[in-house]
Amino acid sequence: PRLDYGKQMLVYENLDAPTGPSLVRYILGHIEQSYMSHALTIHASRFYTAIYPQKYRQMVLENKPVFNTTPVDYSPHKPLRIAYLGNIRYIDILKNLADAVRGDERFKLSYHGGGPDYEDLKDYVNGVPNIFMTGPYKYEEIEHLYGSADIIWAAYPNKDFNVRYAISNKFHESLAYAIPAVYADKTRLGEYVVASSLGCQVNPYSVEDIRSLLIELYSNRERLLQIHESLKRQYREENS
């Protein structure tokens, strides 16, 4: 749809939902709605439409990377290979993941990427024989990194209002390469992947919950293979 006001058109690109304390969200929400009443709003997540009045003109245009690939060959390994790719931040959650597998020979955990908390995390896992930090990578390497993993860690802090409704690039990458990923519970994305057999969800603040899920996936190879097949099928449907 196109909105023309004389010779002007206002397009509001909504990349993130307002977040912060409730008063801040209230103020930002009113500012947003003043824009939306005179604009076409383009949402970067399919889940944002649920938090905005339907009377406004809206469309979804997710920030999907362009993939020239086919799903990688997939066969879960022992030890189970878990990978995090991206900016090293949300350090408490990344430490929880490390604690969930620390010293457990059933798992191999790799953190790929740099960022503000890189040195902190590096010190935290220093000397742990089954945890590795590889540092920054180029995006051209991402297919190889996905192909070297059995599970992708994509659980962000669900206490953040935006995270509850956002859809991450990790979802689109997981779909393209057909590698199962773990997302935060109490989020629309987490609910969606579980309902569609496209991934798993977990409480990212609980080491015990993370450990329990990973042990279940280690013991239940068929669940991972089922998710892999669902991801391939979904990707074909979206790109046919």
Name these PLM-found stretches:
Residues 205-208, 219-240:
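A charged, aromatic-enriched C-terminal amphipathic alpha-helix characteristic of glycosyltransferases
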Residues 119-148:
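Nucleotide-activated donor-binding/catalytic signature segment of Leloir-type glycosyltransferases, i.e.
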Residues 42, 65, 73-92, 97-101, ...:
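Conserved donor-binding/catalytic core segment of Leloir-type glycosyltransferases
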Residues 17-19, 47-48, 60-71, 88-89, ...:
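Short beta-strand->alpha-helix junction loop in the catalytic core
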Residues 92, 140-145, 152-172, 176, ...:
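Nucleotide-sugar-dependent
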Residues 4-8, 12-41:
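Membrane-proximal helix-turn-helix segments that form the acceptor-binding/catalytic region
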